Amino acid sequence: SSDLPPEADGKRFGDFEMDTIVGGNNQGAILTIVERSTNMLFMKKLKFGKDAEELAKAAIQLLSPYKGNIKTVTTDNGCEFYAHKAIAKGLDSTVYFADPYSSWQKGAIENANGLIRQYIPKSSPIKKINDTDIDAIMNKINNRPRKKLDFSTPFEMFSSYLL
């Protein structure tokens, strides 16, 4: 079970959700991470697809600038997350697993992945997408005003916690 502490309900800052987006015919993958309360999205292309060690390194690289602010990371039980201990240690935080078939336990990342799919359809080969494209998509999504945030952007909200 997820055993996520009740205070990680999406209202406090510092609870993250993590997932992967896979290209058509399993061609390549992108690591996606979202901070729950602000919807701030982090993305990184994984050269070797769903490789657990590469994924752990990518997660640590993306989030290490915010190390002191990371309370929890929730992911699913996919085999690519088997290096979760390395992620927990590298980010000085706790990794939780959502229960199988309970995507609502990580609604923020499911929502973000839906937004990403507007730019990267399921059929598209992720191998052909470069890091510049990924950064551009990430910036577009993070600078899109959200109703949930009273029409502030994820970037504005996330930044306000780091001041």
Kindly label every feature range from the protein language model.
Residues 68-83, 101:
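Acidic/histidine-rich, metal-coordinating catalytic segments
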Residues 10, 14, 123-124:
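Glycine-centered loop/turn motifs
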Residues 40, 67-69, 74, 94, ...:
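Polytopic alpha-helical membrane proteins, predominantly small-molecule transporters/carriers
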Residues 64, 88-95, 99-163:
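Charged alpha-helix within mobile-element recombinases
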Residues 21, 26-42:
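Short conserved beta-strand segments at catalytic cores or DNA/RNA-binding microdomains
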Residues 25-26, 43-66:
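Active-site beta-loop-alpha junctions of metal-dependent nucleic acid enzymes
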Residues 13-23:
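Two-metal-ion RNase H-like nuclease active-site motif
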